[in-house]
Amino acid sequence: MRKQMIALAALCPLTVFAVSPVHNRVIDYVPAPGQFVNVLPEWEDGDDAEAMAAKALQYMTGEGYYISLGAWGGYVTVGFERTIVNVPGKRDIYIEGNAFQSSQSSTKGGNSEPGVVMVAYDINHNGIPDGNEWFEIAGSEYSKSIHNYEVSYIRPASDKEDIMWMDNQGNSGFVNRIPFHTQPYWPQWLSGRSKLTFQGCRLPDNSVNEGTADDPYIVLKAFDYGYADNYPNFSDKDGLVRNEGAMIDIDWAVDANGNAVKLPGVDFVRIYTGVNQTNGILGENSTEVVRVVNTHSVGTGDAESVDESIVIDEKVLAEFLARYGGVESLDNSGLRLYVDQSGLVSFSLYEEALAQVFDLKGRCLYSELMPEGRGFVDLSSYSNGIYLVSVAGQTVKVMKR
């Protein structure tokens, strides 16, 4: 038993009581062509898709950086250490961008480049977003948008040429090169591909010229709600109060037919540029993204952490799995263990199961057969150290301190 527990301890990730609410993975980064592509983040000779995803994570979670998704359809997919719980009546996801309000216009917006938000719950717990798990956040422009939209970008013979696009509505145009940005606009780690095709939802144009034809002043209007890079990150001048306009309510999710979906939570978020539009000398609309954050947190700044007392509603989970997960009967195979800051490990069982606590020497410190329903293992009275908590075959390594 001791050898088995030592081996198990080596395999289990360490769970400490402070878990960051910020995304900790970039699963894929696939921008469409654009004026900031290969710059934000910087592509260097030899960088492949994996290297660029790693750079995207570094840019997004570093200080003062963001990534560009390029023209319509370009996207980034991120994951989290903890599921973002869908809390009724609350906005659950905060997405930082680089939108700002124009000081010279009364129009709501200025530099708003809205990105469509997709969300997914990890139904099969495989750690990656499978195709059938994605749901769109239906923002304020959902009914005014073109759905099942598709754009293909054609790689030109030279990196100095504009890049042609064609959509499935019979339209075509160009991602135009502009004097301020002279690098290649085609993602260089995808240089072996002659065409890039994206599918999704095309939002309405949001560009307004508040100047004249000879002296244009372009304002990119903000939509009411439900998009990334649509509102400034903060609602106060000191940058202390997060702007609710930059937040997403998971309850805005819809399926492919536009029907509302009640998700228990979100493990993955995908954001893609939602407006296919060129803005004169400003170039194409290109959504920019910084951090994606779980709003259900405690503390501030570097001390901010996920509020582990907020857990998934098991009834909502059961109904979601029954409808979308192909689950006919529920058991403990998808059990999740939650650890809060007091040292309480909580879970919900669909059938009775054994709960145990071990130290790193393999000694069993606690063992109890737990009934169906909500259950808890309390580590608050234990000495500081590392423990293995095992429930129904699921094990989490917890640092008590």
Regions found by a protein language model. Give the residues of each.
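Acidic carboxylate motifs that coordinate Ca2+ or other divalent cations, activating on Asp/Glu
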Residues: 126
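Predominantly extracellular/luminal cell-surface or secreted proteins
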Residues: 118-122, 358-360
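C-terminal outer-membrane/trafficking sorting elements
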Residues: 326-401
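Short amphipathic beta-strand/extended segments with alternating polar/hydrophobic composition
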Residues: 131-141, 369, 397-401
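A domain-level signal for the mature, folded cores of soluble proteins
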Residues: 19-115, 133-323
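Bacterial Sec-dependent N-terminal signal peptides
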Residues: 1-19, 376-377
